[in-house]
């Protein structure tokens, strides 16, 4: 039913995570995995939580930048210790499928600018720390964490509540 297919909500015309609190008298609609918005949220979760995590597992010294969705998919900008080629994609895809198979829950937490910078400085994620530092925002930085692996990423969200909702995908370009 609708509850089983729900992946996010829209509160006052803003997409939010299912875990977000509702405001009094808010206009609310449910976003399902079968909708265009749900597909975009799945792709966003796939890039921000799965592709980035797989790259960090395989190339621990890679530095993460940003990972948006695009019209027909997603990408993630990162700086690996050595160039990645099209021949590396099957290995990355295999790692992504392992991560998805764990069916990890994804949790969101909010942090001040200083806390968020400290979190990414500790992980030597210079691009993430720079994004936060350059932001006009002072608090409520959203950090998403995979419950099982502890992988974290800075992201605007929303994300799927669990990795087990991710469908089929194929990496095609470097």
Regions found by a protein language model. Name each.
Residues 46-58:
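Short amphipathic alpha-helix segments
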Residues 13, 49, 61, 154-156:
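Sparse, context-dependent recognition of short Cys/His-centered cofactor- or disulfide-binding micro-motifs
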Residues 5, 20-42, 54, 63-69, ...:
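Auxiliary tRNA-acceptor-end handling modules of aminoacyl-tRNA synthetases
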Residues 1-2:
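Short amphipathic, charge-patterned alpha-helical segments
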Residues 6-20:
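Short acidic beta-strand-loop surface patches of small beta-rich interaction domains
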């Amino acid at each position: 039913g609708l509850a089983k297919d729900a992946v996010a909500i829209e509160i006052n015309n803003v997409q939010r995570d299912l875990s977000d609190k509702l405001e009094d008298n808010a206009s609310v609609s449910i976003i399902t995995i079968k909708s265009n918005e749900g597909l975009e949220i799945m792709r966003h979760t796939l890039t921000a939580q799965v592709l980035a995590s797989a790259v960090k597992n395989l190339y621990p010294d890679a530095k993460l930048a940003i990972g948006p969705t695009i019209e027909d998919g997603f990408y993630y900008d990162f700086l690996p210790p050595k160039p990645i080629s099209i021949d590396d994609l099957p290995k990355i895809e295999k790692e992504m499928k392992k991560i998805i198979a764990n069916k990890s829950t994804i949790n969101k937490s909010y942090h001040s600018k200083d806390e968020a910078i400290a979190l990414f400085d500790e992980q030597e994620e210079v691009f993430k720390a720079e994004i936060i530092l350059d932001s006009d925002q002072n608090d409520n930085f959203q950090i998403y964490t995979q419950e099982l692996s502890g992988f974290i990423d800075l992201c605007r969200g929303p994300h799927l509540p669990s990795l087990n909702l991710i469908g089929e995908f194929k990496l095609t370009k470097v």
